[in-house]
Amino acid sequence: MAPALSPTRSHHVAVIGAGPAGLVAARELRREGHSVVVFEKQKQVGGTWIYTDEVESDPLSVDPTRSVVHSSVYRSLRINGTRECTGYRDFPFVVRSGVSRDRRRFPSHGEVLAYLKDFAKEFGIEEMVRFETEVVKVSPAAEEGIGKWRIESTEKEKKVRRDEIYDAVVVCNGHYVEPRLAQIPGISSWPGKEMHSHNYRIPEPFRDKVAVLIGNSSSAEDISRDIARVAKEVHVACRSNPADTFIKQTGYNNLWTHSMIESVHEDGSVVYQNGKTISVDIIMHCTGYKYHFPFLDTNGIVTVDDNRVGPLYKDVFPPAFAPWLSFIGIPWQVLPFPMFELQSKWIAGVLSGRIPLPSKEDMMIEIKTFYSTLEVQGIPKRYTHRMGNTQFEYDNWLASQCGCSETEEWRKEMCLANGVRKEAHPETYRDEWDDHHLVSEAYQDFSLYS
């Protein structure tokens, strides 16, 4: 075990992004006694939860010269986890007063944004944020001393470029901006329209069209039903489905689930692995996103390879730069806000010297062992950061490092019950449930923070 930093030492820390991860990072860093500056490109807090009707000029979002739109939120989006599970651990996502608030248990994106603004107001986060300021480069500043970082940023309105030195950098820029695309044989000569779900907002452009959605994520599930209200036909293709899959969705006359696309052709047809051939107008990729840190220059030490960000100890610290560079929010298939909170507490405590880290050598050994385990299990590199059922073990490990209580039993049970309900009743799980006893347990805990 490497020695901790000087006890209760305060550092000048830059946080990149004022979304859900950046907000709680700023709070925890300041609580630990650090001096914090948050860089945010947009005019307000909220990150990807800030809805906009704007979409990118390139519907596939591959043109490097395009004007990037940060949000991937579509107009009809409602959260797919319960309100109780979604919120930060010590700032519950409860129904608040206000005529414009969404009181549903699975509220809209607008309610999540309002919650994040409530959080920022409650803890005075905005006073730490430089809005409309884009970080263009983050790089080690070795000439300034061990662990120092140079941040180059530009302010949109003032057109001011700053070059500043920080002791540490916490990266919280989200990962719902740079789309991943499916590889489809014949796509270069297919005459129809392609797009990524990042640029989906409303169903109207799909009226009377035949659309194919690729993917099995929550977004594919929700958007396919949204579009089916106006489209002629909607076909959902997924590579994880058996090759003979062809299922008409209950309650719809125009929505089908297929196996993956085998090929597309110049006549506009799409051929599936199940043998079906359909003439299609639009293909939408609901295929997720790439981790993307265009501002980060580490001379190749921290890389993104097939969507593996590495090397990272516990998905947070790159050993070569620990603890002066860290990442929040890399794992997926998790309850994000509670995880962000625990990661933030850990980072803040490590930086202050209160919590020790292993040596760089020991961190690298653990990372390599983890990578080897994934390889032996046949798990693709792109799933390195997928947690799913292991998320609570991870959260509890973080909690043990920080001296916090473990994940509440009600939160674990509620999350698992919601997953079962969602799979069995994708149409109604947001509005019909039977876990009232867990809701009562949650609100008993929430009373501690009211």
UniProtKB/Swiss-Prot annotation:
GO molecular function, one term: N,N-dimethylaniline monooxygenase activity
Record-listed E.C. numbers: 1.8.-.-
Keyword vocabulary terms for this entry: FAD, Flavoprotein, Monooxygenase, NADP, Oxidoreductase
Family matches, as Gene3D superfamilies: FAD/NAD(P)-binding domain (3.50.50.60)
Cofactor(s) demanded: FAD
Binding site for NADP(+): G215, N216, S217, S218, S219, A220
Transmembrane segments annotated in the record for this chain: none
Enzyme class: oxidoreductase
InterPro entries: FAD/NAD-bd_sf (IPR036188), Flavin_mOase (IPR000960), Flavin_mOase-like (IPR020946), FMO-like (IPR050346)
Amino acids binding FAD: G17, A18, G19, P20, A21, G22
Chain's role: Catalyzes the conversion of methylthioalkyl glucosinolates of any chain length into methylsulfinylalkyl glucosinolates.
Family: Belongs to the FMO family.
Protein name per UniProt: Flavin-containing monooxygenase FMO GS-OX-like 5
Source organism of the structure: Arabidopsis thaliana (Mouse-ear cress)
